[in-house]
Swiss-Prot record:
The keyword Isomerase applies. GO terms for molecular function: RNA binding; tRNA pseudouridine(13) synthase activity. Substrate binds at residues 26, 128, 328. This is tRNA pseudouridine synthase D. NCBIfam families: PRK00984.1-4, tRNA_TruD_broad. Belongs to the pseudouridine synthase TruD family. The gene is truD. GO terms for cellular component: cytosol.
Amino acid sequence: MEFSTLQYLHGRPVATGVVKAFAEDFFVAEDLGFTPDGEGEHVLVRLRKEGCNTQFVAENLARFARIAGRSVSYAGLKDRHAVTEQWFCLHLPGRDTPDFSQFVLEGCQVLAVARHRKKLRIGTLRGNQFRLVLRHISDSAEVEERLRRVATQGVPNYFGEQRFGRGGNNLQQARRWATDQIRVKERAKRGFYLSAARSALFNLLVSERLAAGCFSRVLAGDALQLTGRGSWFVAREAELSVLQQRLDVGELRITAALPGDGDGGVGGDAAEFERRVLSETADLQALLTRERVDPARRAVLLQPQAMTWSWWDDATVELTFDLPAGSFATSVVRELFCQENSDADLAE
């Protein structure tokens, strides 16, 4: 289940390149997908930051507003080694909006402040807008061809390496927890470890569909998602031909399991496939069941939107694209070239 061993949609690249030679080579801006209400007991703060991770900024905002750390929320984690524009939410019932022009934190700039009625929770984004500068590319012709394929055919919707912690530590700890080698009491760590476990199982399912030649082929019992929506339905044998046509034109997406405490939501051939692939991961599945993690489904294909690129020279390309919330730029870049700086963290 190592990220480096997962299957490729467009074949393993031969070309090499560098991601984030400089922090400004990686820019990501959150798209809330809604306009703040302008009133309410929550204050939304949009920050441009560099050299600061999300939790560090949240802690400093809490101190500035003189509230508990748990009263500051955000929609997702962003890498410190990048330039990011991110929303934070402060719960300030019955209080005036602080003067955020007085908020000083090295590497941070306040861009916007607005009142809102609801708390900003993890995943409550439309998506993220990315601008990457990819350098030291060894074969521009190969990468150009791959860019064209990715723009039209997409990439596997893998969870990126950062989901599993530095050096895969979160997944390692999840395995130790699953086999009762450790006890995990801290809420944040429990969340990180459980997320790593189910993400690894999802990645395995996606990779094995590629290996089996059914990544883009509807199986009887597959859970199919309407493109751009969260709802899904189960494919019936009698409808496979029509459903395959709808998949081929982009109306539908095949999904894979995000395992938890409950039924996987598939039947027939698809259920048998998922059972077989996950047959040697009983310890992680038992952990997710024991901790009552809600099961879910996630599309196996990620299609970047508004994707454009411009070559600065034969070894440098600027790439822009939009991704839905919860998807990873890592999954796009890994289909383009092999990273020379493979430890680079790409924001979610």
